[in-house]
Amino acid sequence: TIGDRAVRESLDAVEAAQRANGGRDARHHLAHIQFVHPEDMPRFRKLGVVANAQPYRACREAYVTELTEPFVGPERSAYMYPFGSLHRAGARLAFGSDWTVSTPDPLQQLEVAVNRIRPDDRGADPLLPDEALDLGTALAAFTAGSAYVNFLDDETGSLEPGKLADIVVLDRDLFGIDGAQVADARVVLTLIEGEAVYSPSEPGW
């Protein structure tokens, strides 16, 4: 669902299915959501559809400036990767990498989500800065949001008693630094179900 028509028709399909079958915990999600018409943004919350996105592309890179904006025009370009608007409309967000098309590094993805500028191009102008997210919302999309859309929110995605200890420890507090430096953070420990699976100090990891 990259185009706004694809998004609208997908939302229409979910709405029709709910009318025919009644409500259920289906957790439908639309991936990519590069263009979402403003009229359709409130429908995500109304229908319980998750906005599943990969924020690394939400910046002024060649894919946007050379292959997208000249062809879709200024009207549609004004609602490209509208994460901020979707969040304000009450949509639940789930973020991922889209690897191998995009970087698998969530810290780089996070920096774009909060700045709309790529870490390797920090001097660039942001893409639609009003669509940037605060760090807490972006982190929740990568963690709790992704767990929710995969029906794993009872097991992982947040630090709560009884949930799996799936934890990444960084070398700095992301909330204590400039948002433009998020991607500079380094992982010092990764735990999966409480077991250490990565540390840069351990040979072979």
What is each model feature region?
Residues 200-205:
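Extracellular/periplasmic ectodomains of large secreted or surface enzymes and adhesion receptors
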Residues 1, 5-28, 32, 38-42, ...:
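His/Asp/Glu-enriched, well-ordered alpha-helical/loop segment
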